[in-house]
Amino acid sequence: MSWIILFVAGLLEIVWAVGLKYTHGFTRLTPSIITISAMIVSMGMLSYAMKGLPAGTAYAIWTGIGAVGTAIFGIIVFGESANIYRLLSLAMIVFGIIGLKLAS
């Protein structure tokens, strides 16, 4: 169950990371509320997942999911660069996440 909670926490990290762009420095109310709520719930779920997982593993996977998801969102929605170096770097993060899961 800890792994599922950690995965959902990582997805919520994507929500708040992308949401930061839409808050315009927290000057827009609705995106700011959504972003702050996602931050709180994501970190709460991360904390809960750490009850059953090593802290270093949980944190690394949480940030990895957030980083890869946010980068992919940026490529698809914001038209950010998708060059080979960026894609290979994202793939290495994914393989690192898989490795941490297999090692736990």
Swiss-Prot record:
The gene is gdx. Residues 1-3, 51-54, 104 are cytoplasmic. NCBIfam families: PRK11431.1. This is Guanidinium exporter. It holds the Pfam family Multi_Drug_Res. Keywords: Cell inner membrane, Cell membrane, Ion transport, Membrane, Transmembrane, Transmembrane helix, Transport. The chain crosses the membrane at residues 4-26, 33-50, 55-77, 84-103. One of its GO terms (molecular function) is transmembrane transporter activity. Belongs to the drug/metabolite transporter (DMT) superfamily. Small multidrug resistance (SMR) (TC 2.A.7.1) family. Gdx/SugE subfamily. Residues 27-32, 78-83 are periplasmic. It is a multi-pass membrane protein. It is found in: Cell inner membrane. Its main location: membrane. GO terms for cellular component: plasma membrane. Guanidinium ion exporter. Couples guanidinium export to the proton motive force, exchanging one guanidinium ion for two protons. InterPro entries: Small_drug/metabolite_transptr, Small_multidrug_res. The keyword Membrane applies. One of its GO terms (biological process) is monoatomic ion transport.
